Design a protein with these regions (language model features):
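Membrane-embedded beta-strands that build the outer-membrane beta-barrel scaffold
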Residues: 1-3, 38-46, 54-62, 138-144, ...
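Membrane-embedded beta-barrel scaffold of Gram-negative outer-membrane proteins
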Residues: 1-22, 54, 61, 65
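Conserved small-residue
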Residues: 28, 45-132, 163-166
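Short, hydrophobic/aromatic alpha-helical segments in well-folded domains
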Residues: 124-125, 137-139
Length: 167
């Protein structure tokens, strides 16, 4: 079992620029991020014989990261995720979707003034909704051995992760 509490300084970030500069972005070193987590690895010989053996293994990791500082910039929007102080790196953002209007069947969004609109072009209040980096990930592996023949396999998993298709 390993535990860690790491600080990353001078993050290498692709900062978007105004189109008037003639460039779309600039790579800069900015900010600080913390990573805290646990890692567990275990392996056991269930059967250990001269000609036959079975081995099982388990690994699991948990990581929580937080953007702690971005220097002179408050936030970056990159694709479908936002880099903002206090959030985890890889946090998705989208329009604040409020569900379907039961009377019309149209989608409802929150506008910048707090009102509810059905027109996506008038919606402008963005909301975070998860992270594309898994908080938990791991796997279970096994090996079955008979004389000079062995068969092995690995099952992996991850959870507390959201994928988003921006099509």
């Amino acid at each position: 079992l390993d535990a860690y509490d790491e600080q990353t300084l001078d993050l290498f970030v692709n900062q978007p620029l105004s189109g008037t500069t003639g460039f779309s972005s600039l790579y800069i070193n900015a900010g600080r991020m913390s990573n805290k987590g646990l890692e567990l690895n275990a392996k056991v010989d269930v059967i250990r014989g001269r000609d036959f053996g079975v081995t099982l293994g388990l690994n699991h990791s948990y990581n929580k990261n937080t953007i702690e500082d971005l220097g002179a910039v408050n936030e970056f929007f990159l694709g479908t995720f936002v880099i903002r102080k206090g959030l985890s790196y890889g946090t998705h953002y989208t329009l604040n979707y409020l569900g379907v209007d039961p009377a019309t069947g149209n989608p409802r969004y929150e506008a910048p003034d707090g009102s509810i609109v059905n027109d996506q072009a008038k919606a402008g209040q963005f909301d975070k909704f998860g992270n594309y980096l898994p908080r938990h990930q791991g796997g279970v592996d096994f090996e079955i051995r008979y004389k000079a023949l062995s068969i092995s396999g690995l099952f992996s998993y991850q959870f507390e992760v959201q994928r988003y298709n921006n099509i």
